[in-house]
Amino acid sequence: MCHAAPARPGDGRGLPRAGDNFSGAARSKPVGAAFEQRARQFLERRGLVFVAANVTMRGGELDLVMREPDGMLVFVEVRARRSARHGGAAASVGWRKRRRLVAAALQFWARHGAGAACRFDVVAFEAGQLAWLRDAFRADDA
């Protein structure tokens, strides 16, 4: 179903400042939405087409669903951390989270994209920097 793609580093434009405080439950949804919007804009500037956001399927939620020009579906998990302490943003996508993402993605794929190849990317915001991890994990890794 999913296959590997070459990595492409992010350019870091349009990011929060390093001193921004985006912790706390009261701000988590609006702040998360802001990071998802920045991730979406970043990916669109690189040629991906927006399909859906915040899709809740049985078993999990998909932050962003994008499509490559060749038709490949891209399921994007967006993570933000103020620092690399405790592993950082990308490392926070552990095996439990990957399992939930894969379950949700498989349902979405079956309903809306069966036949298309797909992959799982992570857009990580950490200390004011953006990293785009293409093909961050595979369905059989979860």
UniProtKB/Swiss-Prot annotation:
Annotated HAMAP family: UPF0102
Homology family: Belongs to the UPF0102 family.
Protein name: UPF0102 protein Bcep18194_A3391
Matching InterPro entries: Restrct_endonuc-II-like, tRNA_endonuc-like_dom_sf, UPF0102_YraN-like
Region Disordered: start-end pairs: 1-27
Molecular function in Gene Ontology: nucleic acid binding
Pfam families (UniProt xref): UPF0102
